[in-house]
Amino acid sequence: MASLYQRFTGKINTSRSFPAPPEASRLLGGQGPEEDGAGPKPLGAQAPAAAPRERGGGGGAGGRPRFQYQARSDCDDEDELVGSNPPQRNWKGIAIALLVILVICSLIVTSVILLTPAEDNSLSQKKKVTVEDLFSEDFKIHDPEAKWISDKEFIYREQKGSVILRNVETNTSTVLIEGKKIESLRAIRYEISPDREYALFSYNVEPIYQHSYTGYYVLSKIPHGDPQSLDPPEVSNAKLQYAGWGPKGQQLIFIFENNIYYCAHVGKQAIRVVSTGKEGVIYNGLSDWLYEEEILKTHIAHWWSPDGTRLAYATINDSRVPVMELPTYTGSVYPTAKPYHYPKAGCENPSISLHVIGLNGPTHDLEMTPPDDPRMREYYITMVKWATSTKVAVNWLSRAQNVSILTLCDATTGVCTKKHEDESEAWLHRQNEEPVFSKDGRKFFFVRAIPQGGQGKFYHITVSSSQPNSSNDNIQSITSGDWDVTKILSYDEKRSQIYFLSTEDLPRRRQLYSASTVGSFNRQCLSCDLVDNCTYFSASFSPGADFFLLKCEGPGVPTVSVHNTTDKKKMFDLETNEHVQKAISDRQMPKVEYRKIETDDYNLPIQILKPATFTDTAHYPLLLVVDGTPGSQSVAEKFAVTWETVMVSSHGAVVVKCDGRGSGFQGTRLLHEVRRRLGSLEEKDQMEAVRVMLKEPYIDKTRVAVFGKDYGGYLSTYLLPAKGDGQAPVFSCGSALSPITDFKLYASAFSERYLGLHGLDNRAYEMAKVAHRVSALEGQQFLVIHATADEKIHFQHTAELITQLIKGKANYSLQIYPDESHYFSSAALQQHLHRSILGFFVECFRIQDKLPAVTAREDEEED
């Protein structure tokens, strides 16, 4: 049981409180303490892989396995070959026997050489992945953040920091901003004006929530102009909530104190066009906490018309939303608190309205009319997208999130016309995705769920076309099948092609496809076999769809290349991340395997990470990593180097992930299974994955652990008390980072989406609590980690959990991060967090490794 010192000092997982992390070989009972001076040895170098363990598992110094291959003495050979009469030796027989032995030995040696994988020798020379690697420049993926600005040109940032304009057709480059200038301004973000005359920089940026921030902004003429501060007329040196260019010339807006300011061009005084804002209460053009985190998934809540003459913006009113306070314990004699509006399940939600203002001439503010539908008494606005310069598409979603109405609103009158309606018995998924419009706005493509047989609905492209002199639209499905379209990228009118990403290849992959929008809707994969060691792509097309930027995201090292749409031919590489490729080629990277398991008529994918030196004859600890947020995906062919990589590479663990019921991209039947049953079905599926792994001879059944963060922290807490077939605990230990422990304490939009409206029927909320689960803990080590100023999942969740753990006399440890937010923005804190988690599991696996020896000593003493 963790000591009181460990529980409350915050040092339970530091390098002083845990012994130095052992090598993978030590975790597996290989190198003994007496060999420490020899330095770490790779796992595969300790004993021949084919050598069987001697039964009883005991023997040799340091607890190392003994092997049955032993040399026989000369006397043994004499007795066997000659008999008991010494003078009568058969020298010829001895010579023949020795010759046979030599031949057999040579055959064995030859076989070992031929059958040993060629990589084994090189593996022993490679380094193991460490926590330091995660934060080193060698492993930092560079994303050029390329953005198309014309049919043939895009802007990107090179590794040295300079901002480059690249012409695809002429293959020429122009430096717009030197990297040194960005460094001198201490700028964190930059943006180029549409006419390429000015650059906008932000510096001294201070994060607010996941996406939002405040910062100082300056404007500078390209390439070498002096910076000039961007401020509202009434304030100098103001810290702004947002600033950004419009679609034309040098027009820009910025937001200060939740009010919107407009500037027609650089040098002209900004005018306040929206002035109803109230700090922390009424947001104009920006999201409040709930919309930023759960609905729009961005802090930006304003949208320019294509011609720059109008601006649509949301007004979000939090005045009736209950206030949460985030305490600050350090830096003052008395703790202080930061209040903000946070709606929990069943509480008052923010109200929202959508407005359009004209930017040419006198400001005219017009509110778009919401649907007149009794199911929409409370609603969210989940998507806004301009179709033309006077028409704007808006998606309205009921608070219960089971009814949505897509409308097309007239920006000159405020009248909204219904274009599509969707309804679900569970919840509506993927509600903030934007449709793609034709130039005249009469045709648009959007993704909707379509029935595809026994697996329920899958998300496919539908085209809606307005008919002349008719109020009814013609709707057709472009794609179909038991796979999902994950994103519509572009519509090429001149070629009648739609471009999109999908899971048609496999759910864990993302390939780029095109489909004809006429005739039989013929479909073609553009990215299949296009890039070596890459099956997970994203892409962006030039405005005319003649070229596209193709971003490989895995399983190999991410790259970015430019292609011609006509023949898919690669024109050039924009980024290859060779430094990362070199770094991982020098490391013992995990081996990745994929399997499927069967449970309750479902085939569920699992991902297994094994040490590079993996052998079937060794015994490895098993770590189950859970996420499982409904609609998410854990098993994907994406490149990542994380603390899990360190756990596998440096500490010889096997890591497994499973996409069970509630996960995305496998049909709505599997997705919606967890409705009003959070926790129970996920437990069943994750435990089935563990049971499958425990059948493998290379898994040590005494060293099994579970980890999760956020919703995954909820699941890891839910799973930890699980029992095996013999009613013994399956897990030796577990850890939860920022766990949700009671959904009535969490965000309204999230909890109500999956458990229903709180207050109408609370049984689903009560059943989902982890309190009734943790009372069944039987001595398993449990590490709970939480930041005290977590704005997303309040420390209140962990406080409630600890209360239950104390009542149940559980063996828990608590690690807090004082005054830190949910996202751990500091690299130093992230590094400490990773070390803490790794140290906990290394110690857990080491203790379990010693238990059999301790038991044996106790038995000897009793005898």
From Swiss-Prot:
UniProt PTM comment: N-glycosylated.
Principal subcellular localisation of the protein: membrane
Keyword Repeat: no
GO biological process entries: protein localization to plasma membrane; proteolysis; regulation of potassium ion transmembrane transport
Annotated GO MF terms: potassium channel regulator activity; serine-type peptidase activity
GO cellular component: plasma membrane; voltage-gated potassium channel complex
Key words, A-Z: Cell membrane, Disulfide bond, Glycoprotein, Membrane, Signal-anchor, Transmembrane, Transmembrane helix
Residues annotated as glycosylated: 171, 402, 469, 533, 564, 811
Name of a matching Pfam family: Peptidase_S9
Compartments reported by the entry: Cell membrane
Keyword Repressor among UniProt keywords: no
Entries under Gene3D superfamilies matching the protein: alpha/beta hydrolase, Dipeptidylpeptidase IV, N-terminal domain
Disulfide cysteine pairs (residue numbers): 409-416, 525-528, 534-552, 733-844
Subunit description: Homodimer (in vitro). Interacts with KCND2. Identified in a complex with KCND2 and KCNIP2. Forms an octameric complex composed of four DPP6 subunits bound to the KCND2 tetramer. Interacts with KCND3; this interaction modulates the channel gating kinetics namely channel activation and inactivation kinetics and rate of recovery from inactivation.
PANTHER family recorded: DIPEPTIDYL AMINOPEPTIDASE-LIKE PROTEIN 6, PROTEASE FAMILY S9B,C DIPEPTIDYL-PEPTIDASE IV-RELATED
Protein name: A-type potassium channel modulatory protein DPP6
Organism (species): Bos taurus (Bovine)
Protein's gene: DPP6
